[in-house]
């Protein structure tokens, strides 16, 4: 499976590490050369320097025959535009966009097809949901010593 990860911050780097270790064909896109070089040295990935929302950069990354694009930049708007552009080039590609601004959450969910999104992810919201879920277990915060 060919996967493109746009945005190589904490989320993008973690995805690159995990997915390349699982044997996926990974191409990274970022505007920072140093970030790309660091990830290419550490993981079995390809890299493209450029703006992930431009057709030129996406084509260099191989979007025309990619199976999945993960837009994980720090800018929600860029992630949406990147996903839409990728889908415009390759209508069969699946897209996942990181959307962190709560103002966009409902709107993006309702317009998922318009934005050509297979899935949206909000890491901060997911962390909050997981913490809330764990706190529902009565013994979660209780620690026993066995020594």
Q: Which residues does each PLM region occupy?
A:
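Cytosolic regulatory regions of ion transport systems
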Residues: 1-147
């Amino acid at each position: 499976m060919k996967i493109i990860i746009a945005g190589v911050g904490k989320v993008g780097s973690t995805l690159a590490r995990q997915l390349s270790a699982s044997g996926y064909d990974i191409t990274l896109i970022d505007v920072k050369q140093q970030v790309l070089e660091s990830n290419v040295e550490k993981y079995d990935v390809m890299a493209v320097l450029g703006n992930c929302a431009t057709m030129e950069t996406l084509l260099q990354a191989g979007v025309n025959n990619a199976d999945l694009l993960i837009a994980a930049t720090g800018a929600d708007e860029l992630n949406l535009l990147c996903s839409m552009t990728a889908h415009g080039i390759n209508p069969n590609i699946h897209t996942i966009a990181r959307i962190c601004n709560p103002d966009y959450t409902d709107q993006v969910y309702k317009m998922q097809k318009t934005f050509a999104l297979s899935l949206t992810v909000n890491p901060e919201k997911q962390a909050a949901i997981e913490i809330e879920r764990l706190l529902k277990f009565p013994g979660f915060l209780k620690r026993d010593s066995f020594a």
